[in-house]
Amino acid sequence: GWPAYPGSNGIRSSVCQKKLGCGSKNLASLGVCKAFCPGRKRFWQKCGKNGSSGKGSRICNPVPAHAVEKAGKGLIKVTDMAVAAIAKYAGKK
């Protein structure tokens, strides 16, 4: 299924960052969010509510779009885990 259009407010980068809890747990996730959220915003601006720009653009394919929505959430989790691991490792030396 096509991911639900977040609404004109929901595509805002700041809303995306807040939703993902960017930088709230650790600052490293902020960088990931700052890369992910504007990209996501551009995607929705380009592809519109139904996920197709009408030009048959590959970027608007619902499959990668759905993956991107899920990956965004997963990305932050992974970043948090990686930073925790690095901090732990650095503390050992």
Curated annotation (Swiss-Prot):
Tissue specificity remark: Localized within the skin and proboscis and are most readily isolated from body mucus secretions.
GO molecular function: toxin activity
Keyword Transferase attributed: no
Keywords tagged on the record: Cytolysis, Disulfide bond, Hemolysis, Secreted, Toxin
S-S pairs: 16-37, 22-33, 47-60
Gene Ontology terms: cellular component: extracellular region
The organism's place on the tree of life at top rank: Eukaryota
Intracellular or extracellular location(s): Secreted
A GO BP entry: killing of cells of another organism
Family named by the database record: Belongs to the worm cytolysin family.
Function: Cytolysin that shows hemolytic activity (on bovine erythrocytes, HC(50)=5.75 mg/ml). This hemolytic activity is completely inhibited by small unilamelar vesicles composed of PC/PG, PC/PI and PC/PS in 1:1 molar ratios (with at least 100 mg/ml concentration).
Entry protein name: Parbolysin P3
Natural source organism: Parborlasia corrugatus
Lineage of producing organism: Eukaryota, Metazoa, Spiralia, Lophotrochozoa, Nemertea
